[in-house]
């Protein structure tokens, strides 16, 4: 009887290796992730990218090569590859990290490129974002620069549910630049409490002792008339 834990562990390792291979080969295509699904007729591989055409290639040539690599190197049975576009790429941390790394390799100033990426992320509806660029930014000594806006969770239950984190590498003349992008997805925050406004109720004003005041005033008038007489 096969070991169930070992079986799923091996499948997870294969998926991680495929993900690392695709991230290394197709970071220019804004690679976002992969899903490996077992089907009765083989293995279905779904690749998400910001630029699917760069992975597909002319006439689907790259897909045929990928199918051979998945079958021979990673041991997938009859791989069926599907390449699809990413929904809301500005809210995908890996896509934005690769975009920022490509911008740095093209010669954009790191601070300007980071501000542009941050603006695109926040305009897409993110609750918060954090961008960290490390390397020999301005001097020969390596350092890092951080840009943060909005809400970014560092721990707790919200970290796994709402945070998307990715790391990319840019190869420049001064050396290797590291890029880290953290995005807080626009989901419902569990620890946020909104107080309901109480319905406005018209205030009732009650007037008392009106009759007593009138009687006392009449008595005082009669008394003053009697004194005059």
From Swiss-Prot:
It comes from the Archaea. GO terms for cellular component: cytosolic small ribosomal subunit. InterPro entries: KH_dom, KH_dom-like_a/b, KH_dom_type_2, KH_sf_prok-type, Ribosomal_S3_C_sf, Ribosomal_uS3_arc, Ribosomal_uS3_C, Ribosomal_uS3_CS. Residues 18-87 form the KH type-2 domain. Keywords: Ribonucleoprotein, Ribosomal protein, RNA-binding, rRNA-binding. The keyword Ribosomal protein applies. GO terms for molecular function: rRNA binding; structural constituent of ribosome. Binds the lower part of the 30S subunit head. HAMAP family: Ribosomal_uS3_A. This is Small ribosomal subunit protein uS3. It comes from Saccharolobus solfataricus (strain ATCC 35092 / DSM 1617 / JCM 11322 / P2). The lineage of its organism: Archaea, Thermoproteota, Thermoprotei, Sulfolobales, Sulfolobaceae. The gene is rps3.
